[in-house]
């Protein structure tokens, strides 16, 4: 237990002395909020035909494939609440310690927790757009129709509405990716949280920090390719952030 306490003390020390702290988050922090991991053992991709859900060619042919599966998984997100990782990161930002959150997630829970500088490298459902014209609408506007399982359509031209999430077959949002690379390069300490670092190009972001002389800490329940680059390795996200939160409240 003493060793664990020392490890948490060391992690907290690195967090608070960092000049440019950045967090890089993945699906593991969403599972704490009751959202299934896409690739986990009970994840969405383990269910029949769900790989078609985020296939851009399938969407253009038949958008009902996406909306039929997404009505609960995506448009039920309004009912989900941030977990302790989300709330502690928001607190760190509010205190001026954390400079940016880079996330692979599409659940908007960082924003719901109060984080302001959130970079969504796989796109965001906060905006939906017509695939034919320039019309856009909010998540909430689209969700009204999407929750029924129907395909939301543009009020101007009648074409399907698509979330600004990156589907398979689409490029990542370049503006967000460039901003993420900039933040990772500036970071002298990066928290890698709940991601196994398997999906590129986002998985390479810790390398930007390391290349520029920064350090990383990894909190994930599975090994990653960057484990050998740090001695700050933790498995339990919830426990780790409870320990960070306890120390933060004493500051």
Curated annotation (Swiss-Prot):
It is found in: Cytoplasm. Disulfide bonds: none annotated. Binds 1 zinc ion per subunit. Its cofactor is Zn(2+). Nicotinamide binds at residues 38, 106-107. The keyword Transmembrane helix does not apply. The active site is at residue 122. It is an enzyme of class 2 (transferase). Zn(2+) binds at residues 130, 133, 154, 157. Transmembrane segments: none annotated. NAD(+) binds at residues 27, 31, 38-39, 104, 106-107, 122, 195-196, 220, 237. Keywords: Cytoplasm, Metal-binding, NAD, Transferase, Zinc. GO terms for molecular function: histone deacetylase activity, NAD-dependent; NAD+ binding; zinc ion binding. This is NAD-dependent protein deacetylase. The gene is cobB.
């Amino acid at each position: 237990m003493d060793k664990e306490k020392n490890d948490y003390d060391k992690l907290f020390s690195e967090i608070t002395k960092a000049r440019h702290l950045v967090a890089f988050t993945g699906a593991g922090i969403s599972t704490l909020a009751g959202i299934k991991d896409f690739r986990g053992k009970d994840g969405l991709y383990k269910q029949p035909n769900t790989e078609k859900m985020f296939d851009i060619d399938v969407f253009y042919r038949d958008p009902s494939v996406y909306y039929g599966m997404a009505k609960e998984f995506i448009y039920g997100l309004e009912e989900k609440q941030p977990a302790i990782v989300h709330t502690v990161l928001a607190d760190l930002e509010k205190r001026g310690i954390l400079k940016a959150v880079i996330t692979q997630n599409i659940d908007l829970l960082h924003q719901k927790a109060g984080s302001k500088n959130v970079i969504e490298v796989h796109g965001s459902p906060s905006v939906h757009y017509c695939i034919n014209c320039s019309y856009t609408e909010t998540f909430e506007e689209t969700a009204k129709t999407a929750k029924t399982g129907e395909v939301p359509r543009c009020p101007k031209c009648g074409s399907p509405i698509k979330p600004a999430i990156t589907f398979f077959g689409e490029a990542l949002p370049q503006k967000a990716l460039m901003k993420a690379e900039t933040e990772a390069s500036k970071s002298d300490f990066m928290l890698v949280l709940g991601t196994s670092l398997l999906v590129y190009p986002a998985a390479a972001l810790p390398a930007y920090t390391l290349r520029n002389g920064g350090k990383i800490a990894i909190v994930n329940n599975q090994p990653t390719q960057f484990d050998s680059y740090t001695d700050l390795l933790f498995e339990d996200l919830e426990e780790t952030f409870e320990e960070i939160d306890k120390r933060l409240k004493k500051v």
